[in-house]
């Protein structure tokens, strides 16, 4: 994929992929093809162009399902990115199930996108936001987990891979321990899906947000809805 980055037509070392990644030529070509040949709404028309777009959209959903090994394509919800996906969970699950006195646990490694929505939700609901710290090695301090993971914790938010440190967190262990007390787990997989094979069924996470950019996924364009979520 790196050789297909259009921006590499000049000497450049780009190390800010944690913030945003460059688009390879196949993505740009597919987007251009869409706008030039079959620009239309998805699931909003019965004419030819709309049918083409709808079929492509649903094929993209099936591709994502297979890629992250979700149990059903119905588990895949397209959003504009991991940030929107996390906010979607906060404003749906969070508003419906988080109550006064409940606790939400995140880690010290989280991107602001997996902190601020929970801060705002806790302010609205009178809930408590707790933070699992990391140690001098840049690893989560699991020795504090038993203290922080109380029966009041209703949701745990954890990054699969830190966007700053690159630490690969033991998310499967965290998910198992959270589930034992009845908490739901949201995994921010934005920095993991490009480098680690993802199997959401094996992880047993409740919600997962990811940003996907891979050649195999370009067979069908993601129209209007840009990124994938909800195993994103």
Question: Model features per residue range: what roles?
Answer:
Residues 1-4, 8-224, 232:
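Pyridoxal 5′-phosphate
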């Amino acid at each position: 994929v790196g050789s297909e980055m259009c921006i590499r037509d000049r000497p450049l070392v780009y190390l800010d992929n944690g913030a945003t990644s460059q688009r390879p030529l196949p993505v740009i070509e597919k987007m251009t093809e869409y706008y030039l040949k079959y620009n239309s709404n998805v699931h909003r028309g019965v004419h030819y162009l709309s049918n083409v777009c709808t079929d492509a959209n649903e094929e993209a959903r099936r591709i994502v399902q297979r890629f992250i090994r979700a149990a059903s394509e119905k588990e895949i919800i397209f959003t504009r990115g991991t940030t929107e996906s996390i906010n979607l969970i906060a404003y749906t699950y969070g508003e419906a199930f988080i109550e006064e006195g409940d606790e939400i646990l995140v880690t010290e490694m989280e991107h602001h996108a997996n902190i601020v929505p929970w801060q705002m939700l806790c302010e609205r609901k009178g809930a408590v936001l707790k933070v699992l710290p990391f140690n001098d090695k840049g690893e989560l301090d699991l020795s504090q987990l038993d203290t922080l993971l109380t029966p009041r914790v209703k949701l745990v938010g954890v990054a699969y891979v830190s966007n700053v440190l690159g630490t690969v967190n033991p998310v499967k262990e965290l998910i198992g321990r959270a589930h034992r007390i009845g908490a739901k787990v949201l995994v921010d997989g934005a920095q993991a899906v490009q480098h680690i094979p993802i199997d959401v069924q094996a992880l047993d996470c409740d919600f997962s947000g990811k940003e996907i950019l891979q050649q195999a996924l370009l067979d069908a364009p993601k129209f209007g809805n840009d990124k994938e979520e909800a195993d994103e």
